UniProtKB/Swiss-Prot annotation, chain B:
Coiled-coil spans in chain: none
Location of Phosphoserine modifications: S626, S652, S655
Protein's UniProt name: AP-2 complex subunit alpha-1
Chain intervals for the UniProt region annotation (Disordered): 615-675
Keyword annotations of the record: Cell membrane, Coated pit, Endocytosis, Membrane, Phosphoprotein, Protein transport, Transport
Tissue: Expressed in the brain (at protein level). Isoform A: Expressed in forebrain, skeletal muscle, spinal cord, cerebellum, salivary gland, heart and colon. Isoform B: Widely expressed in tissues and also in breast cancer and in prostate carcinoma cells.
GO BP terms: clathrin-dependent endocytosis; endocytosis; Golgi to endosome transport; intracellular protein transport; negative regulation of hyaluronan biosynthetic process; positive regulation of neuron projection development; positive regulation of receptor-mediated endocytosis; postsynaptic neurotransmitter receptor internalization
UniProt-listed SMART domains: Alpha_adaptinC2
One annotated GO molecular function: protein-containing complex binding
Ranges of biased composition (kind: Low complexity): 646-665
PANTHER family: ADAPTIN, ALPHA/GAMMA/EPSILON
Amino acid sequence: MIRFILIQNRAGKTRLAKWYMQFDDDEKQKLIEEVHAVVTVRDAKHTNFVEFRNFKIIYRRYAGLYFCICVDVNDNNLAYLEAIHNFVLNEYFHNVCELDLVFNFYKVYTVVDEMFLAGEIRETSQTKVLKQLLMLQSLE
Amino acid sequence: MPAVSKGDGMRGLAVFISDIRNCKSKEAEIKRINKELANIRSKFKGDKALDGYSKKKYVCKLLFIFLLGHDIDFGHMEAVNLLSSNKYTEKQIGYLFISVLVNSNSELIRLINNAIKNDLASRNPTFMCLALHCIANVGSREMGEAFAADIPRILVAGDSMDSVKQSAALCLLRLYKASPDLVPMGEWTARVVHLLNDQHMGVVTAAVSLITCLCKKNPDDFKTCVSLAVSRLSRIVSSASTDLQDYTYYFVPAPWLSVKLLRLLQCYPPPEDAAVKGRLVECLETVLNKAQEPPKSKKVQHSNAKNAILFETISLIIHYDSEPNLLVRACNQLGQFLQHRETNLRYLALESMCTLASSEFSHEAVKTHIDTVINALKTERDVSVRQRAADLLYAMCDRSNAKQIVSEMLRYLETADYAIREEIVLKVAILAEKYAVDYSWYVDTILNLIRIAGDYVSEEVWYRVLQIVTNRDDVQGYAAKTVFEALQAPACHENMVKVGGYILGEFGNLIAGDPRSSPPVQFSLLHSKFHLCSVATRALLLSTYIKFINLFPETKATIQGVLRAGSQLRNADVELQQRAVEYLTLSSVASTDVLATVLEEMPPFPERESSILAKLKRKKGPGAGSALDDGRRDPSSNDINGGMEPTPSTVSTPSPSADLLGLRAAPPPAAPPASAGAGNLLVDVFDGPAAQPSLGPTPEEAFLSELEPPAPESPMALLADPAPAADPGPEDIGPPIPEADELLNKFVCKNNGVLFENQLLQIGVKSEFRQNLGRMYLFYGNKTSVQFQNFSPTVVHPGDLQTQLAVQTKRVAAQVDGGAQVQQVLNIECLRDFLTPPLLSVRFRYGGAPQALTLKLPVTINKFFQPTEMAAQDFFQRWKQLSLPQQEAQKIFKANHPMDAEVTKAKLLGFGSALLDNVDPNPENFVGAGIIQTKALQVGCLLRLEPNAQAQMYRLTLRTSKEPVSRHLCELLAQQF
């Protein structure tokens, strides 16, 4: 199960934090900093997986942004690694830069909820997700 | 198609965000935020009613401010108002605000229940999904109480839209995980299983997660899911890469759904139905075949998606552990990955192969990759990959390759990362012992360990080498020669001095014939290290010296000179001073015969389990050593290397000299054999008979030391009552008094106190437990001024208990004078796990009238807990290993006492498990671990207690390797809060 999803830039600024288990605010801040510390020191020769506390982080870097998913240790690494890509790949984000995530932060949550819910993968079809998001966008 | 674009929607929000981004300093940002907060506050307070758009905009600004890390203390009502809007965009911002802020303000939840109810009933799929997502995101118990009953209905309703079903399934999953008691099982469960057949793959994707979670708790209710999952999987696996259209990802059909289905199947044993099983095996073979086909795309996404399925397939094959052909194929596939250029694949292959190594079918196949794995240990850049390689070498080790693996691990140790050195040391020590054919190799290996990584060689490791050398006379001469040589090094680690000192003190005579290691040379070599060593080591060396005086009378004068020196006799350290004084006196006053008896060679150590293995298990969780313990792939190993146990006669009939040396209660493996042994030695020599095991009532002071675990072969022999109390048959005693259970509960977490009191009699308890043994003192106080007559307390074992728990009692005086107290000693041995406590029946005559009373003796299974410290990672690994439904017991209950964290801690410690900090991500929760020690078996236990202060509830989860124990512990402990 996914414990949290973080999108951070290289400077450690959080662009999205989605939590699937209860943490208090201080703990969230600590987790954000720790994840940034473990992920940014790794290079291309390293795996995309890091043991993290009692969990593991599956992460992928896109330009200046790190997309990190924290999951249980026995979860399937590659499935989550590609889940990140499937999320980023979405047409809805086509040509989107970091700044767009900042200005449209409230929409990003909607995209996340379409694809992940309750810490599980909800929908994997690009087409279905896009159709749903466009439908929602057409609503007032 | 840039669907996300700047300023889309709310202009004011975009302006505000731009302003914040343009702030040059933190101060400027705070100033801008405060200005905005003042603005929003005035808008919300103003007389003019805000329209929906403005409300949405301001709430969204507040949310942005909150996400920047600032506290928000208003605006909640406006957000709640947005929920009742008919416009999607307004509703969405309202729900988002609540989902994000709910942690900090749970009051909010009560306010929104109504709005959620309306949206769930709205029949508008968009609104229903928003409401379901909100419930799933918050996932609190309150949410569960309000909605858990409605969601199954939405999930299985024929007219629910697909997207609603997807959300409902996962929403229900979240509620079930948070509060399983609130989700009623019912006829909907059968229909949920049939969602596996749903046409919409998204619905299946969501439903599989729900079913996987539900079936772990109720495997029987959901077992029809196996055949449905197999046929679904089969359809996906056999489809062409374009058949599934939307659900094909880089030419791989439905990778995530396949992975989820394979994980669901891992909740069950292999299908019994031959047709289903055949179909499944076909699927698994297809996946393995596809791995050999040329890739349909060069993109890494294609191979990742394909391999995600492959690794999950291999997990399932390993889980079944019944198809040799598949296991070997899996192993070959992983072998290819070991040399793949992708680091991810090498890492995952090492990890997966580690579990394959423990299957008898694939162990040999795994071993063929040894060279590649050794190479990985040497060359991988990522430390986590090297760690996996070390794990795999450990897992694949057996007698045939032990020498190679141990020497490679030793070599790796020289450059290994500090974080994993201690673990590598333990692994090397275990492998060396386990697979030693000749023990000289073992001794060399351990001495190498000390040489290479002395700081990381824990006490357990060097105690162990001493135990083995002491117990095996074929290696003693070699050990003496080798340590002597090792000590020649100009700089040697203090642990080497300890081992050398001990071994030469015992077996130095075996090499004394060689003039190069004559007694004076041995002594001066050891003594040259003396001054650089810590107090503990110097104390050990002093014991070596006195042993030298016995072994080599010619060194007596020199050694007495050393002992007599002011630096020893007046040493500031009391221990050293005492040893010097006492050894000096001993060497002067005792005759040669006495000296020879007192300083005789140490008798063999009684052996149960390698203390190192126990330590690794503590580090890695109790299951860590299982691959090694399990002798099936190397049946001969037990015969040779299990031969460490001394012959029973050595121990069960202790010779006088053994007793004199304080070894009648052999030190537990973890106790320093040298310092503790030597300490006892003196006391015993000078106190003589007092050190003999006393059979009469023991003074309280000696209580603890008396409880040092005696030799396992005859645990009770030394404490035995000359006249074991005859148990009266159960028919002779009355039923326990009504409050017996309540009285028993008081003692679950404590060992001492008043067990019972009425106007005549008070019964006090003092007890102490160690491993699987216990001793209990019962104090019977006569509260009257009249003598009790025919006073006879007896212990009765109802039912099977006789075979589970041995209790020996001593008789007490039949008369108890008025105002007097008598004491009764009970020796208790836990033979195996038990559920019901023994009964204590007390009868006497008071003023001519017979009195009878039956109580439950406060001996519960948790008394035999041995706390186990482990790191968070190990805890979770172990926790996962105990994931069979029957291994877990869970209880959710109301708090009966005020919920105080300190009190809870004390109770859990009193219960007997270790409390592990920093394991649970939620600091409010308590996590514990321990091993229940019985004579027949050990039961590893993990527990987790989650208080919910708001609801005044607890959730208690226990996982043990034995089903009834989980349930019983859970019941015992739940009554304590």
